[in-house]
């Protein structure tokens, strides 16, 4: 009887050790996935930025900060129409960005669809006049890798239009990561999709930091000047799609034509300029979970006649000149996550890391120890009954 009990204990102990060895192989992959109940909100600090006020431009009324500017004095309607663009650029506009992420269908054990609403708001006006820009982004990703699936089902709606089929944005195959880094993020460059430029760029690993007592990886990217009119037109007309009225509305502010003097140039002939965009994006990532725990963007949108002039304006000397003259700026804003956003994202990262640690290390060790105990007891029983 004792010998049988000893054998049974040895078998049980061996089984527990086998489970302990195999547990990380079976359990960890199930934990290294984007949760289907993911919901997150990130908000930036309210900071002053520079903004071309389209409502003031439409009314030919200088922004409050320009009312004492000699260049912006006008009495008659004709004088008001001739006011330079400079008069409608407010360099003291309090701005804030808000982003909401949630999971939508299709979603299952392998894929998840992230629906991301991002709004850029001005803090000195009430709804709905406080809205500067809105984007509704839908991206279906592999839950394990965080990379988009290789199917044309992602979409980006500029200014989040509402309505029928005319307002449905085009669908496309999305390259690059964006809202989540891969689990086990590495010290290397990753392809990153920029939703403003509608293009992929490399985001580079630049070092390690500590945030809330946790090691994080810092990644950064510099996006050179991008012609938004051209990139959006290319996006809207992909696969032979025709421009809709909603598309044309989104494109309207991306290409403007005014007499030369309104742009701060000599002459009265009409000059057509396109809006360009450049950005320096920096993110901090908790490497085990791949969760982004901090974000900063230095965005600059401006008007230029071609790529060459855009490069000149985006250069250090060009930025300094434009900061003084302010004839071409559409928007300039440094967005920095607030403390609440950093804290919430770090909590998500810690929870994911805790689950991975328990599943990959703690639980196997406990099972291994529990397996050794009956094995030792079993051998002792066998030796005594021999």
From Swiss-Prot:
Its main location: secreted. The keyword Signal applies. Transmembrane segments: none annotated. Pfam families: PorA. Keywords: Cell wall, Ion transport, Secreted, Signal, Transport. It is found in: Secreted, Cell wall. Residues 53-63 have a biased composition (Polar residues). Residues 53-78 are annotated as: Disordered. GO terms for cellular component: extracellular region. The keyword Cell division does not apply. Belongs to the PorA family. Forms water-filled channels that favor the permeation of cations. This is Porin PorA. It comes from Corynebacterium amycolatum. The gene is porA.
């Amino acid at each position: 009887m004792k010998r049988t009990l000893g054998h049974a204990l040895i078998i049980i102990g061996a089984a527990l050790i086998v489970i302990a060895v195999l547990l990380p192989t079976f359990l960890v992959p199930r934990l290294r996935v984007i949760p289907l109940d993911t919901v997150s909100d990130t908000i930036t600090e309210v900071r002053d930025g520079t903004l071309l006020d389209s409502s003031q431009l439409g009314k030919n009324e200088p922004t409050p900060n320009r009312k004492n500017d000699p260049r912006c004095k006008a009495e008659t309607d004709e004088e008001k129409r001739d006011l330079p663009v400079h008069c409608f650029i407010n360099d003291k506009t309090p701005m804030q960005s808000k982003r909401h992420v949630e999971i939508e269908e299709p979603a299952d054990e392998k894929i998840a669809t992230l629906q991301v609403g991002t709004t850029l708001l001005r803090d000195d006006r009430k709804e709905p006049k406080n809205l500067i820009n809105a984007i509704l982004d839908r991206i279906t990703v592999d839950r394990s890798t965080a990379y988009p699936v290789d199917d044309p089902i992602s979409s980006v709606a500029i200014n989040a239009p509402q309505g029928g089929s005319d307002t449905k944005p085009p669908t496309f195959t999305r390259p690059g990561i964006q809202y989540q880094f891969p689990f086990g993020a590495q010290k290397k460059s990753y392809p990153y999709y920029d939703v403003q430029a509608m293009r992929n760029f490399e985001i580079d690993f630049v070092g390690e930091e500590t945030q809330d007592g946790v090691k994080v990886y810092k990644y950064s990217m510099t996006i050179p000047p991008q012609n938004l009119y051209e990139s959006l037109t290319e996006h809207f007309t992909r696969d032979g799609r025709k421009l809709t009225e909603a598309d044309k509305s989104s494109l309207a502010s991306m290409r403007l034509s005014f007499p030369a003097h309104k742009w701060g140039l000599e002459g009265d002939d009409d000059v057509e300029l396109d809006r360009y965009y450049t950005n320096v994006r920096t993110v901090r990532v908790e490497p085990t979970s791949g969760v982004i725990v901090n974000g900063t963007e230095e965005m600059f949108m401006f008007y230029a006649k071609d790529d060459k002039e855009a490069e000149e304006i985006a250069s250090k000397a060009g930025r300094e000149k434009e900061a003084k003259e302010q004839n071409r700026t559409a928007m300039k804003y440094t967005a920095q996550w607030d403390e609440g956003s950093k804290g919430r994202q770090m909590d998500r990262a810690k929870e994911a890391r805790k689950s991975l640690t328990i599943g990959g290390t703690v639980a196997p060790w406990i099972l291994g120890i529990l397996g050794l105990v009956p094995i030792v007891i079993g051998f002792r029983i066998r030796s005594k009954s021999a």
